[in-house]
């Protein structure tokens, strides 16, 4: 059931020829195996509701460990979210100058699991009034495809921009520019939908042209956007403008 939602979201975010056909085939196989799209749709709705009610959590990671699904041979002992939150609050400081200079920064977790560290970083950025959707590239990598997909689902639903790489970080690490990762043999890249928005598209364009692609360029080209929403079931929707 996990695969159906993953494949659909990737097809929306990544329609490159080298990925599209294989993803369409996997999508069809998931539907055939499950018998219908209703089960994964209900599961996705549960995840969405959980993250809407409480963004400050690693919902899938906690469930994964509570069900004793972790593989100790792969070192799957997920860091508790409270620890990830503490680390993000310690490290996510003095970032204004970096964003002002380049327009964005990248945050990488080479052993992402279900994405707790990156989720905590996104929430810390939001707490500090930084629009992480437009100014942070989230890069995740994990050797385990299932946990990597859990990370992809949660970061995508939280509106993060970036990608997840399924591969061994030690023997097959990501290479290339952070905006243009090289997908090597043995790697599987999953691009988050938000990474295809107008601002990141302009940044990749300017980077490919040799420009800086920083704040001044992209924000003059792309007006402040109001359609990136954070949801809270107990409050009205809040729109966060670019900073």
Task: Please describe what each predicted stretch is.
Residues 81-185:
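Conserved S-adenosyl-L-methionine
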Residues 21-90:
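Conserved Class I S-adenosyl-L-methionine-dependent methyltransferase catalytic core
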Residues 154-243:
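S-adenosylmethionine
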Residues 3-8:
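Short, small-residue-biased leader/transition segments that mark boundaries at the very start
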Residues 60, 70, 96, 227-230:
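Intrinsically disordered, low-complexity regions
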Residues 15-18:
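Long amphipathic alpha-helical segments that form oligomerization/scaffold cores
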């Amino acid at each position: 059931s996990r695969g159906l939602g993953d494949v659909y979201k990737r097809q929306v975010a990544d329609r490159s020829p080298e990925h599209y056909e294989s993803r369409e085939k996997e999508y069809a196989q998931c539907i055939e195996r499950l018998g219908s799209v209703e089960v994964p749709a209900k599961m996705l709705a549960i995840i969405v509701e959980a993250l809407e009610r409480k963004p400050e959590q690693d919902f899938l990671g906690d469930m994964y460990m509570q069900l004793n699904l972790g593989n100790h041979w792969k070192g799957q002992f997920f860091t508790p979210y409270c620890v990830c939150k503490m680390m993000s609050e310690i490290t996510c400081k003095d970032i204004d100058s970096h964003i002002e200079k380049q327009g964005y920064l990248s945050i990488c977790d080479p052993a992402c699991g279900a994405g707790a560290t990156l989720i905590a970083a996104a929430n810390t950025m939001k707490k500090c009034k930084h629009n992480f959707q437009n100014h942070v590239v989230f890069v995740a990598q994990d050797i385990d495809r299932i946990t990597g997909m859990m990370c992809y689902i949660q970061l995508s639903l939280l509106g993060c921009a970036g990608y997840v790489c399924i591969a061994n970080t030690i023997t097959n690490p990501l290479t290339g520019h952070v905006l243009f990762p090289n997908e090597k043999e043995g790697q599987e890249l999953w691009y988050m939908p938000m990474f295809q928005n107008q601002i990141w598209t302009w940044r990749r364009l300017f980077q490919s042209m040799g420009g800086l692609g920083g704040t001044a360029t992209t924000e003059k080209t792309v007006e402040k956007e109001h359609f990136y929403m954070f949801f809270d079931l107990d409050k009205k929707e809040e729109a966060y403008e670019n900073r």
